[in-house]
Amino acid sequence: MIQFLLAAPRSGSGKTTMTCALLMALKRRGCAPCAFKSGPDYIDPMFHRAVLGVESRNLDLFFSAPETVRTLYAKGAAGHGAAVCEGAMGFYDGLGGVSDRASAWHLADTLGLPVLLVVEPKGQSLTLAAELNGLVNFRTPSHIAGILLNNCTARMHVLLAPMLEKEMGLPVLGFLPKPVSYTHLRAHETSAHL
């Protein structure tokens, strides 16, 4: 089964947009994906439902023990060809903003999921590699397995991808372009670049 968690250095990086694009791409490829959201957020799961037409489940390590979260994940993913988890806030941001407990990293660690890091390369190039190196090396294991660029032009992707792969030793798996207007963006236009 295809399974991964999408995370980002901070809120507002495009995790939900990227999650919905990947869910749609997996659905179109016949993978029968299911969706999960870390924490108690009910808004992002509504977007997942709109894309998939199925329920999106919350996995919360504050309200539930790790064993319970593992069971909920296994039951929710059963019968699906792909399971996509969307992290909340910044990758390591957990309880009170000063702990990694109940963070996206904690969820990836609990479930043993690879992490795809969604980053916006706005106003950065090589400095982005330094920032990402910090995220990769902050906890061991970080579970970070790949990078997705958001709000990125094709030209910037061609420039950044080889540099990031060289500096990070991680693949840049794709990008989403900066849309003219999110209100005019259709799901098939978003997922076409992945």
For the regions a language model picked out, list residue spans one by one.
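Conserved small/polar residues in nucleotide/adenosyl-binding loops
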Residues: T183-T190
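N-terminal low-complexity segments that are often proline-rich with Ser/Thr-Pro
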Residues: A192-L194
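GTPase G-domain guanine-specificity segment
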Residues: N151-M168
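Short, structured patches in soluble enzyme cores that scaffold and shape functional sites
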Residues: L148-C152, L176-P177
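ATP-dependent carboxylate-amine ligase catalytic core
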Residues: I2-T17, L23-L111, V119-G146, R155-L159
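Short hydrophobic alpha-helical runs that function as membrane-insertion/retention elements
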Residues: V115-V118, L173-F175
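Beta-strand-loop-alpha "switch" segments that mediate conformational coupling across diverse proteins
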Residues: G169-Y182
